[in-house]
């Protein structure tokens, strides 16, 4: 317990000294606020379009039948998928390059202690930032809790994935994977084939669940998020036993 607490405090200090994660999170919040004001709906134009025109467009272009993304939802998924995976991996790689990880291992630290301590610190920062994402997206009351539950659980999976990639022998693979999980759901809003391919990824499930947030939380997104997190933990344990992790 003492080791996990020390790792937690150490990682919080590292993120304050090198505030890349916090800076990117704040940048996305500002973009949500700005784009919300710039992309206000044109109600007069919507009213003047005859109903038969909309039906014809849906038949000819099925992309319009996909759920319309919310601005807060898009940037939240980008932060949760791309930024959290990249930042988690970078934080672990920093510990490796500065030899802090080796010193902690020599002092008796266990792999699960490092995983829990680091993941807890990253999760605290992520949820704190996601709270302001909810406010910027105008999610209040119960919707705020639903939003945080969805994005927070997705962020936790990204953190676990990033830590595992950062400790692996190929940490560079975290970058293309984070781009896929971060930008994939955004592009899937405008491409039916991509939406079909990414349907069972945890970031896409969060993206769809945010769109239907007013209808309440469904069980399916959490099943996919939980299954992804479990597979990540299993992969972490397997890589550790096979000696694929570099401490």
Q: Which residues are covered by each model-predicted region?
A:
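Transmembrane helix segments
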Residues: 34-44, 165-204
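Hydrophobic/aromatic residues in alpha-helical transmembrane segments
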Residues: 81-88, 132, 160-164, 235-236
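Alpha-helical transmembrane segments and their short interhelical loops
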Residues: 111-112, 118-169
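Junction motif at the cytosolic side of a transmembrane helix
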Residues: 11, 15, 226-247
């Amino acid at each position: 317990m003492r080791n996990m607490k020390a790792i937690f405090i150490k990682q919080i200090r590292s993120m304050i000294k090198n505030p890349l994660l916090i800076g990117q999170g704040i940048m996305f919040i500002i973009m949500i606020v700005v784009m919300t004001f710039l992309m206000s709906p044109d109600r007069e134009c919507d009213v003047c379009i005859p109903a038969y025109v909309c039906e014809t467009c849906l038949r000819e272009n099925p992309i319009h039948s996909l759920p319309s993304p919310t601005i807060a939802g898009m940037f939240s998924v980008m932060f949760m998928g791309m930024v959290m995976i990249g930042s988690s991996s970078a934080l672990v790689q920093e510990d490796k390059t500065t030899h802090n990880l080796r010193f902690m291992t020599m002092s008796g630290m266990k792999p699960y202690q490092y995983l829990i301590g680091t993941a807890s610190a990253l999760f605290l920062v992520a949820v704190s930032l996601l709270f302001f994402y909810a406010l910027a997206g105008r999610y209040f009351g119960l919707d705020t809790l639903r939003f945080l539950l969805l994005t927070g659980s997705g962020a936790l999976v990204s953190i676990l994935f990033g830590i595992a990639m950062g400790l692996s022998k190929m940490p560079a693979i975290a970058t293309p994977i984070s781009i896929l999980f971060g930008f994939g759901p955004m592009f899937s809003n405008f491409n039916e084939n991509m939406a079909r391919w990414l349907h069972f990824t945890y970031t896409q499930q969060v993206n769809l669940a945010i769109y239907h947030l007013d209808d309440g939380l469904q069980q399916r997104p959490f099943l996919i998020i939980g299954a992804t997190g479990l597979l990540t933990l299993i992969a972490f344990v397997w890589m550790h036993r096979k000696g694929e992790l570099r401490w």
